[in-house]
Amino acid sequence: MAHKKGQGSTQNNRDSIGRRLGVKKFGGEFVRAGNIIIRQRGTATHAGNNVGLGKDHTIFALVDGFVKFERLDKNRKKVSVYPAA
């Protein structure tokens, strides 16, 4: 004879909330210094010119300018900010 009732579905239906990752400012968009461009886990996209990399791998603008996504090499991409001329 069982000493506990079957657990059934009581241990199901839990999930963590989404982390709101992804690109926040797209190519060609104007950004101000400090604006977040990408939130990511790990460096899927690398930091290029005039952008900083936070300790959680967030890429943010260091200067006012326009966002540009570029290739770093065959397998990697980077994002840069170029000041308005």
UniProtKB/Swiss-Prot annotation:
Protein name, entry field: Large ribosomal subunit protein bL27
GO cellular component, one term: cytosolic large ribosomal subunit
Source organism superkingdom: Bacteria
Transmembrane segments: none
Keywords: Ribonucleoprotein, Ribosomal protein
Entry GO MF terms: structural constituent of ribosome
Family of the protein in this entry: Belongs to the bacterial ribosomal protein bL27 family.
Gene: rpmA
Entry's Gene Ontology BP terms: translation
A Pfam family assignment: Ribosomal_L27
